[in-house]
Regions:
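A charge-rich, low-complexity, intrinsically flexible signal that marks solvent-exposed coils, linkers
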Residues: 3, 8, 12-138
């Protein structure tokens, strides 16, 4: 359940989510949002792809980690799982690219999944990234 309230001086209402037991909680990964924007600005995007076919699998993640550090890896995920230590794959959620480019279908998948499970901060960030990408290509 969402509860919107306006904090004094806040530009928009703060959204609080009643936590459902057994459902992971996430915070927004700001460095990932910055990376996504840089990729869009650098025209490093794929506009048409089937996300189910191109999203990174566990072996893709392992290969990436063989030649990149955890900070770099983490910037491909919009969400940080609360209560899970850094530098573990379980910490990072809502992948939006293939470790090379951002995929429009990946952003849509993040938005959909976040909306479905009521992770409002992730949902809004994915929505804003999708709008940013669509404005850049218009």
């Amino acid at each position: 359940m969402y509860v919107a309230r306006r904090q004094r001086g806040a530009a928009r209402p703060v959204t609080e989510v009643a936590h459902t037991p057994g459902v992971a909680r996430y915070t927004l990964n700001q460095p990932a949002v910055a990376r996504a924007r840089r990729l869009i600005e650098g025209r490093q995007y794929v506009l048409t792809s089937e996300w189910g076919e191109v999203q990174p699998r566990a072996d893709d993640e392992n290969r990436y980690l063989e030649s990149h550090d955890w900070d770099d890896y983490s910037e491909w995920f919009l969400g940080l799982t609360e209560g899970v230590p850094d530098q573990t794959k379980g910490r990072y959620a809502f992948v939006f690219g293939d470790f090379r480019r951002i995929h429009r279908s990946g952003i849509i998948a993040c938005h959909y999944r976040a909306a479905e499970w009521r992770h409002k901060e992730i949902e809004l960030a994915a929505h804003e990234l999708l709008q940013y990408l669509d404005r850049r290509i218009a």
